[in-house]
């Protein structure tokens, strides 16, 4: 049965805090930057409108089933994922894998490869449907966590909403279901605590600027822009981090975009360049959560 809640707006869940006037977070050995690599794995149901499009339908008419865009995403699971996996393993980068629970059912080889690699499993709902369009939000959350836990033997601690969507009640449902952190908010360079009707949930720093969907699918930038923008972004935060406030930089990847042949080079160069700097660590979401919670308890 769906639990009815009043809900809270984000500003009611978090305290306003400027980065210049808050307790310092510290990284060992003078660390300054945490890189948070995120690999999103999704299921696009061909019976519905596609989550994203690389090609618009003829005459602009809605198209269902949408074979062209469905197959574009399918390439990511058949080829792009494996290209990214080889790159990440060669660089000793262990990403947070945020996946629709249905990936475990529809693409068990892909999910199994992540499990064998020891990567963190983060819940991304059951399939790629926006949270604010669900009639049974809590039921879908529970199903997502249950399916992933059954597959990997561990319940996810973190969550990304499909398309970063939420309702005013989502965080309350997530906290009651055992979720400890979310990645849906892009409001800071450091983690923050968000209050819920149950236990506080940490909002880890995410961003749109270094998101492959935003850069490559919405803004239609050339492939090298991924690397160039990431380095500009990193250089600024690296310089600022001398103030005693380590920053978090999230790098979001989708196999059908970042795993394409003409982009993988620039994704690899981004990680190589950033990780070559002293004082930079590469952590998954659980590591960032534990680091933050130990120094600034909820």
Regions found by a protein language model. Name each.
Residues 205-238:
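A conserved mid-domain beta-alpha-beta active-site/ligand-binding segment of alpha/beta enzyme cores
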């Amino acid at each position: 049965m769906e639990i009815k809640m009043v809900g809270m707006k984000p500003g009611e869940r978090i305290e306003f805090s400027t980065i210049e006037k808050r307790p310092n977070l510290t990284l060992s050995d003078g660390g300054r930057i945490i890189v948070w690599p995120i690999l999103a794995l999704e299921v696009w149901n061909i019976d519905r409108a596609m989550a994203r499009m690389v090609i618009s339908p003829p005459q602009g008419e809605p198209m269902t089933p949408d074979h062209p865009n469905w197959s574009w995403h399918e390439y990511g699971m058949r080829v792009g994922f494996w290209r990214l996996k080889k790159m990440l393993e060669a660089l000793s980068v262990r990403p947070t894998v945020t996946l629709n629970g249905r990936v475990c059912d529809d693409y068990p080889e892909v999910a199994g490869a992540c499990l064998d690699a020891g990567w963190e499993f983060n819940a991304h709902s059951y399939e790629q449907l926006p949270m604010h369009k669900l009639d049974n939000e809590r039921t879908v959350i529970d199903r997502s966590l249950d399916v992933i836990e059954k597959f990997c033997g561990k319940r996810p601690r973190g969550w990304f909403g499909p398309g970063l969507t939420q309702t005013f009640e989502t965080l309350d449902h997530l906290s009651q279901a055992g979720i400890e952190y979310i990645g849906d908010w892009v409001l800071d360079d450091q983690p923050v605590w968000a209050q819920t009707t149950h236990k506080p949930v940490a909002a880890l720093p995410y961003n749109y600027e270094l998101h492959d969907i935003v850069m490559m699918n919405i803004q239609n930038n050339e492939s090298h822009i991924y690397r160039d923008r990431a380095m500009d972004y990193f250089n600024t935060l690296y310089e600022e981090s001398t103030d005693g406030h380590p920053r978090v930089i999230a790098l979001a990847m989708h196999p059908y975009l970042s795993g394409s042949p003409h982009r993988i080079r620039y994704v690899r160069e981004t990680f190589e360049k950033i990780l070559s700097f002293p004082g930079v660590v590469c952590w998954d979401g659980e590591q960032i959560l534990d680091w933050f919670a130990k120094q600034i308890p909820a």
